[in-house]
């Protein structure tokens, strides 16, 4: 037995003819073939090796012998079946249209016709039935004519107003036109009242509120008791006011003759009055019975401290040097001389300032002032001086 590997285009009929064997024998040996008529390349076919006689077909052109029976071809049953093309009987699916929802009926709202005048109120529903009123007979006036028809004959109808446009009106005289002034628009012209001088208004007088100025804190080693400064006479003329403020006017009859000097703790805007006398009030007299103090603060004679300034118009003069014993020697005031500002000459500063205006009650010649405390004794305590 031989094994034949199927090549492309081979069949069992060709393989049996090649090896000279019967086809039926080849089919019997190859029982693994489910369809002997269909073999694929690469398959192994078993072929018998024993010689099997092969029947030869008669040659064409020679007539068969008489009485010979025509035998059927042994491979007639093994002829390949004709391939029949089978059409697909499955019906084709029709293309379905997309689902479109039905459109609603866009008809206008149809309202039933009803009689508008045929309506009933709630009051009419509950009213009792009443019979209809009988119709009154109409009165006919045969001989009476309306007097208004006769009035039309007395007043004839007026003419139509259509021809009033063509009526002749009296001609108006031509008035001269006012000359135009260039550069001025009437809309932008503002009528203003000219500035008229206002009458003078009397100043408002108010009673001044006094307060005691406190001294600048100093070292306890320095002389002085640290008490508040006593009152002093008011200025003959007002001090220089601060910018943006008006001086306070005080009535002369209510002014006690004292006012408070500006110092670093002061925040009041009070200034001196006009014509205040330069004398001490009995209620605010000097605590030591001396002359009232001048319009300046005396500062302790310490190196680096502010130097006191004399009254405006008087220069201090001493006939002898100070011995330092705190005596009652008082300086003499010389003839009036215009002195400048103090060491720190600002009228609004509490220390080292001078009275910018001379005392109206002082004499023009130099005169001694008795019982006037010295600069160093102005703020001392009496009990310390007696010791």
Swiss-Prot record:
It is found in: Spore cortex. Residues 368-377 have a biased composition (Polar residues). Residues 70-96 have a biased composition (Basic and acidic residues). Gene3D superfamilies: LysM domain. Keywords: Sporulation. PROSITE patterns: LYSM (PS51782). One of its GO terms (biological process) is sporulation resulting in formation of a cellular spore. GO terms for cellular component: endospore cortex. Several coat proteins are extracted in reduced amounts from SafA mutant spores, one of which is CotG. SafA mutant spores have abnormal coat layers and have lost their resistance to lysozyme. Their response to L-alanine suggest that they have a defect at a late stage of spore germination. Their response to AGFK also suggests that they have an additional defect at a early stage of spore germination. The mutation of SafA has no effect on vegetative growth and spore resistance to heat and chloroform. In wild-type cells, during the early stages of sporulation, a product of 43 kDa (the predicted size of SafA) was detected. However, in later stages, a 30-kDa species was the major form of SafA detected. The N-terminus sequence of the 30-kDa product starts at Met-164. It is not known if the smaller form results from proteolysis or from translation initiated at Met-164. Probably involved in the assembly of some coat protein components implicated in both lysozyme resistance and germination. Could be required for the assembly of CotG. Associates with SpoIVD during the early stage of coat assembly. This is SpoIVD-associated factor A. It comes from Bacillus subtilis (strain 168).
